[in-house]
């Protein structure tokens, strides 16, 4: 038998051992990262509490009964505890009647008061909190690696332990005194080590370490950019770590305590869910699962879709066989639903709409997963479900679409009642004061409760009414569940093109004009037949229902003009390059004074610089911008100090068009932008991502897709 190369084997064994140690260290460092975050949160909470001292009178010192001459402090100009905290010992000592003992007592009392405030303080992140934001972002990155590497880590540990426990493979001396059986064992073990260290599995493990190191060392600029793009993820992480407290009374709202405890006691399985949930979202998912047939009415922007996906992920994880979910939604959000499900879960998606609907239906029925269809397509699939298959959950988005019990689409959906183990209706429209509409919806999910609701309808603002609704209707508002500084959330609204959109887009491709193609879905005069136009109207309707104002941005004057015509009187003003700079503030002032639901139209470059538009809390972009700075300059007009509402940003996009390519291009180049967060010449060089070569390639690609016969 040929003797193994024990020197080489020792190197490989050391590599395996080092990898195993690094893996264990990777998980151990999670505790250190969490502790660092808690300490940084404590510092910020203390700072915030200290800032609040200005709101408390120096008279608070009297309550300590420490004999402090409060009147002398007031006479010297110290009116608040904040004034005292900011003063030096020498400044306080100069006040007549205040000696060292009183200074010591004052410092102790003010410190204790500040500490008590910080205990209940909600950490409110600001861009300047670079240390905490960076620590959170690094933790997110590292935790994802730890989660993804879980199975590999266990496998590596088992093999490392096995190798470490074999004395014969480590020492050539054993070979000299071993019989043929032990030598054969040693050769087999050596062969295993060579194979293992060259395997794809071991390579993947080493790849995890590279990703982990990247996460540990990512820059503060990258972290700040991520925070500005989606602060909600940072707050969700803070909440999950216990560094900020969810507003529990409003998570449950008026749900009776016994029911709330029953719901909260449900063990939510998120093993198949990829993302972070806020406390109120966890409760919402549990509510959906525990109550089975419900109406989720959370205010727009609180993540009803994510809660529904979390519930689906739980059902899928606990099921023994395949699951069937059916989502019915407006056509304008079909693509969005598919992308969200794929983003936050491992559930297969099937779009039941348009050409190929029968084939997609058959594959969904056979393979399981989530089918997504629009109201208009229900007639084509209902016969295939009714009395033929079971649905683990039926989800009706924008449920007010079926408020009319006599409408054909309502009758189609009601036929699936007996086939659905769970039914979830979703709407962001407040229904408490629309009792008849609510009863029509409740009659679908809980017909036994309709008469009870109607019996107390005349006291719709009293606790009895809410308690009657509690088992079937859950609604939370932003002001109730998001107590921190308002986060900004961005959503991609993928709108499937209409026939008019497609025809106009094909004509634009024929011109080979990049600028014309960018106006996809806004090229035709009549935007009522535009997919983006329809979705824009829906979003503006939601703004009216929620009592919010919206800013609509486009790079193009023609688009602004056509959207103005579409919106009509709800548009309070237009800011474009044609409007003189001195007139723009007057338009902003008029918008600020306008009624809720009003819309301001802005050309990106005209309305993106030098204006404060805090009156708006909804921002809609009609197309992707060629420079990230254009987008963020526009957003900064709304999302800035003084904004008291959560800001929701919608990007209107059409799949299989120039929009999709531009979004991908932006994502590919994001790392370059993260390196140059500040405005500078260098930032500008990285900012202009749409170079001529890329544009030419894109036009060629679109031409081949839509005009394959045109040379």
Region locations from a protein language model:
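Conserved helicase ATPase core of P-loop NTP-dependent helicases/translocases
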Residues: 359-362, 549-553, 561-562, 566-607
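Small-residue hinge/turn detector
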Residues: 66, 84, 96-99
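Interdomain linker/hinge connecting the two RecA-like lobes of the SF2 helicase core
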Residues: 435, 439, 448-451, 457-548, ...
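Charged, low-complexity
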Residues: 24-50, 119-122, 135-294, 321, ...
